[in-house]
Amino acid sequence: MRPLVCIALAGAIAGLWLHGAVAQTSPAVQPPSGTSEPAFTPLTTRWAFPNSDAVNAGTVSIITAPAGGAKSVFAADMARVLDEKDKLRILPILGKGPVQNVIDILYLKSVDMGLVATDVPEFYKIQYGSDITNRLRYIMKLYNDEIHIIAPTEIKTVFDLEGKRIEAPKDVGLYSAKAIFSRLKINVTYDSSHLNDDTGALQEVIDGKADAWIVGTAKVMPIARNLKNEGRRLHLVSIPYDQRLQDLYLPSEFTSDEYPNLIPPGEKVDTVAAGILLVVFNWPEKHERYQKVARFVDALFSRIDEFAKPPRHPKWKEASVSAVIPGWQRFKPAQDWIDRWHEQHLDAANPTSLARFKDFMTQQGHASLSQEELEKLYSQFLEWNRRAKN
């Protein structure tokens, strides 16, 4: 075929194609004959490009832990439930864990809040001799991290670890190990060389190179539950709720249903649990970031009941807006919200209820409690009762 003919044909084809394209983008497409449907008009409205100041004003970030654990899931849940387009947006950030999260909250400009365990300040006192709580404020307790210790069955309780070598990954186990063993005056040798690698650290115990492995994490932990414990050589070690631990931890337990490979059928193992707190830097009240977090707190507290329902993480049922954490000061907007709720609900529902609660506490030998302490306890009781009904 001659070149000029090819060019002519190509031009004709292009003309036909363009004619079809123009027809397809005409303002109105008429319906087929015999129908009564209205003509379709293509949408021509364009979106306004976001304003950078508005985007930043409504965005807060939360640093968590490696993907897959409860900490990262909790932040993702908050991002989904509380999203309000330009008004409020939560950016979850995968972090290393509670110890590094403190450093990131203090020094990373892009981090507004983070998840920190209640025993982390104790770790900083031991390691650095400094109190970090005067530079931080907690918003609320989110859930509990149970302390897991796996060791050979001849080690029955935590006290049997005297003089032993402990695998304690830095950001998931070392901080709890230091706090617990220091409080209980148990001398051990720590190996934290695996940092965040809790699987590699556990393998050291499986291979007989270490005597025990410790991590603080929400049960049920897949690594522990899926451990192939041939001959049931390993088990979960008991941690009694010793008085020396009670300002840092809550009592908890593991069951054979949770860890059938590490606990004999029908038995339970005592342990302790550290609260996981949502923590913010102690900003001045007039600071822009203080105001941003304050707006987030109002949204979170106002919708807290939504988190206790599926498909959210089941550990949300342990969340407590009003829990008082020893050694910590609460973020003022969070405390203000609780105080307002207290004024609206405590005596409004039943004017005699607080007085009756005070009588009950007196009968139980707690007559020395101040009015403020009574009101906080009563507030916690009401919240617990409300959650139990849900």
Locations of regions flagged by a protein language model:
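Bacterial N-terminal signal peptides
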Residues: 7-17
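Sec/Tat signal peptide C-region and signal peptidase I cleavage site
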Residues: 17-23
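Immediate post-signal peptide segment of exported/extracytoplasmic ligand-binding proteins
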Residues: 26-62, 154-165
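An extracytoplasmic/periplasmic, membrane-proximal ligand-sensing/linker region
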Residues: 36-38, 200, 217-231, 236, ...
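Bilobed "Venus flytrap"/periplasmic-binding protein-like clamshell domains
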Residues: 59-82, 90, 145-203, 207
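Pocket-flanking alpha-helical
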Residues: 76-80, 91-132, 200-204, 220-227
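Pocket-lining segment of extracytoplasmic ligand-binding domains
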Residues: 118-119, 128, 186-288
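Ligand-binding clefts/hinges and TM-proximal coupling segments of bilobed small-molecule sensing domains
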Residues: 171-183, 252-326
